[in-house]
Design a protein with these regions (language model features):
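Short, surface-exposed, polar/charged, turn-prone segments marking secondary-structure boundaries
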Residues: 43-45, 90-95, 110-112, 168, ...
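Flexible, glycine/charged-enriched surface loops at secondary-structure junctions
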Residues: 45-56, 114, 185-199
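Small-residue-enriched alpha-helical segments and adjacent helix-cap loops
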Residues: 1-105, 118-126
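Active-site-proximal loop/turn and secondary-structure-junction residues that shape catalytic pockets
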Residues: 70, 110, 154
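Flanking helices and flexible, charged tails adjoining ferredoxin-like Fe-S electron-transfer domains
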Residues: 123-211
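Iron-sulfur cluster-binding cysteine motifs and their immediate structural context
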Residues: 77-80, 101-118, 129-146
């Protein structure tokens, strides 16, 4: 009996958490899937990959993940390219009543209340839980954007994605465009982005794709 023809896989996968629709933890609730798809379409990645790999399997796909908060339900740390919505927190010392609700809300222990509010930026993941709970608006969202992660993968030699930095959406889309261009320039069958980053060195790769 003739086997039914299998539907061809796309050259990329895009995984978006439900925060784009509804989630109490979402830092940004906007659905940016269309913007990412536009960058992918203009890059020529689909034509490039399908012209070189037959048949196309899941491990050949360029994997993108979008998470609306640091909880990472879309598994951004194992994607080739990922965006995690984040907030930069502003401080208004004069409004602080010293109630301590922010320190209890912070899962990263990034806040302390000795002689005013102190925020340890090296620990803060930008979840904005402190700003949401502060009754005096002493902590507030100063800016929202995305943490850009690059080169995550599982498989035989797994690699957690490394973080490039905090960027606006237009900046992040520009980074995706450059990442795809560099990957196509250096591509060979079986090469994943994480492998390329390790070969080039993270520092050189980040300089090449950064804004």
């Amino acid at each position: 009996m003739q086997q039914p023809e299998q539907k061809a896989l796309p050259a990329h996968s895009l995984k978006v958490c439900r925060g784009a629709v509804q989630c109490p933890h979402a830092v940004l609730g906007q659905d940016i899937g269309a913007e990412l798809e536009t960058v992918l379409a203009h890059s020529g990645w689909a034509e490039f990959l399908t012209g070189r790999v037959h048949p196309l399997r899941h491990h050949h796909q360029f994997r993108i993940a979008v998470s609306s908060c640091p909880n990472g339900c879309s598994q951004p740390h194992i994607a080739d390219f990922a965006l995690i919505a984040a907030a930069r927190i502003g401080l208004a010392q004069e409004r602080c009543s010293g109630c301590g609700q922010c320190t209890l809300a912070c899962a990263e222990n990034a806040l302390s209340l000795q002689d005013g509010i102190h925020l340890d930026q090296s620990r803060c993941l930008g979840c904005a839980a402190c700003a949401r709970i502060c009754p005096e608006d002493a902590l507030f969202v100063e800016q929202t954007g995305y943490r850009v992660l690059l080169g995550g993968k599982l498989g035989r030699h797994p690699r957690l994605a490394h973080e490039l930095g905090f960027f606006t959406l237009p900046q992040a889309l520009g980074i995706l465009e450059r990442v795809l261009r560099v990957l196509m320039e250096q591509y060979r069958p079986g090469l994943r982005l994480g492998d390329l980053i390790e070969q080039m060195s993270r520092k050189k790769f980040d300089i090449k794709v950064g804004p």
